[in-house]
Amino acid sequence: MALKELRIGTRASQLALWQANWVKSELEKRYPDMTVTLTKIKTIGDKILDVPLAQVGGKGLFVKEIEEAMLRGEIDIAVHSMKDVPTEFPEGLGLYCITEREDPRDAVISNNVKFADLPQGARIGTSALRRQAQLLKVRPDLEMVIIRGNVQTRMDKLKTEGLDAVILAAAGLNRLGFADQITELLPTDLSLPAIGQGALGIECNLSNQDVKDAISFFNHPDTSRAVRAERALLWRCEGGCQVPIAAFGEVTGDELKLTGFIASVDGKVSVKGVVTGPADDCEKLGVKLAEQLLSEGGHAILAEVYQREVSREKEIPV
């Protein structure tokens, strides 16, 4: 093991620090003589908290500044929530490891009221257009309230903003020790997860073989294939993290099942599909499903979503 030091770049949120510290701890266990340090970096997604992410626009809202630090040689690796990682990287950088997935489902936090039992016109807090579209599809009576901030802040808004429920990723709640706050886990056929939800990604300079050798043990092959399929679908749809596109890959043996979903923001128009095939062909399967969804109405849906996004971007000073 040639490396004596490894510098990790991370956002400063509670969840991001948990994730980065987990990577740090695993590295220290594996390489007791290595010095592992954390550098906290504020991203544009962290700085703009009073505007819904979909209105901020653009891609890489939670990674761009971290990648810039890597390009300047200030950090060696970056730890990301996979659902925040764009499908394209700056030249020389790339995703080298995808960790084993935590629970990929969405979780309901409420006053012990399950989703199906929420009252007519219930106010639901969420940060994702993907969730909003899918839940409105089955419950058009709901009022969606866009909430921002870290996990604890969003949970607190159940009371501070008079919400009936808050929808968050189960993975983050589990990692931070909030599993006991979950009222219900939504099945994936009701709320298909975000691309990469529940998995962590480790990005590095792809020319640094010592760093790649040091972190390679983090990669979980089945999760990697599933997430690569999901990301290929997103790439083919030219989608960012803040559009109503969802995908979920499941690997069983050598087979991959990929489910994808594209919807209008209000959930009134949507298209959903499934493909299966060899797990080693994960990215081809992702592109195949994307093209199927686009041809069945997804292209028109996304054109309208992106047009709305562009018009809103012009109104927001960043």
From Swiss-Prot:
Cofactor(s) named in the record: dipyrromethane
Signal peptide stretch: none
Catalytic activity: 4 porphobilinogen + H2O = hydroxymethylbilane + 4 NH4(+)
Keyword check for Metal-binding: no
Molecular function terms from GO: hydroxymethylbilane synthase activity
InterPro entries, alphabetized: HemC, Porphobilin_deaminase_cofac_BS, Porphobilin_deaminase_N, Porphobilinogen_deaminase_C, Porphobilinogen_deaminase_C_sf
GO cellular component, one term: cytoplasm
Keywords: Porphyrin biosynthesis, Transferase
Modification S-(dipyrrolylmethanemethyl)cysteine occurs at: 241
Pathway stated in the Swiss-Prot or TrEMBL entry: Porphyrin-containing compound metabolism; protoporphyrin-IX biosynthesis; coproporphyrinogen-III from 5-aminolevulinate: step 2/4
Superkingdom assignment: Bacteria
Entry's EC annotation: 2.5.1.61
Biological process, per Gene Ontology: protoporphyrinogen IX biosynthetic process
Pfam families documented for this protein: Porphobil_deam, Porphobil_deamC
Cofactor note: Binds 1 dipyrromethane group covalently.
Other known facts: The porphobilinogen subunits are added to the dipyrromethane group.
Family from the record: Belongs to the HMBS family.
Function: Tetrapolymerization of the monopyrrole PBG into the hydroxymethylbilane pre-uroporphyrinogen in several discrete steps.
UniProt subunit comment: Monomer.
Name by which UniProt lists this protein: Porphobilinogen deaminase
Taxonomic lineage from the root: Bacteria, Pseudomonadati, Thermodesulfobacteriota, Desulfuromonadia, Geobacterales
